[in-house]
């Protein structure tokens, strides 16, 4: 706002509007997220979200999306899902859900989709809010 004083009021109003919108979203999630949800993700992409809202993925099929998980990793996740009675396994729209579906079918866990990149959302001023709300809603279904 100081670099473009002619539009200072516009920037300040936008900032205030955005911060209020963010506060409302955070308050909604804080009040109603299922902190006891048991879930596994396709890859470990949600640590900031998990830490901020007091939840934790119990595992991830892969740490690096460039490397497909091997038979050992798949077996370990399958055993984890069975041993911990994990309810949900999440895939991502950017990757083939075949392995997630296979593990879910053999364990009875439900599947869902988490989109850490927001690739399924329309670009624009609401993209971030839609992304965070979608993560919340899908995790809360768990």
Region annotations inferred by a language model:
Residues 1-142:
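Extracytoplasmic metal-acquisition and chelation regions
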């Amino acid at each position: 706002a100081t670099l473009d004083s002619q539009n200072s009021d516009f920037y300040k109003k936008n900032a205030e509007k955005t911060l209020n919108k963010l506060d409302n979203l955070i308050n909604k999630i804080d009040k109603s997220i299922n902190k006891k949800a048991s879930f596994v993700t396709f890859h470990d992409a949600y640590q900031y979200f998990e830490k901020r809202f007091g939840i934790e993925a119990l595992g991830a099929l892969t740490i690096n999306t460039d490397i497909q998980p091997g038979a050992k990793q798949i077996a370990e996740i399958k055993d984890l899902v069975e041993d911990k009675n994990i309810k949900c396994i999440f895939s991502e729209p950017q990757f083939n859900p075949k392995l997630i579906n296979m593990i879910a079918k053999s364990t009875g866990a439900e599947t869902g989709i988490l989109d850490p990149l927001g690739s399924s959302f329309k670009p624009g001023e609401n993209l971030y809010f839609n992304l965070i709300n979608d993560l919340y809603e899908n995790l809360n279904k768990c």
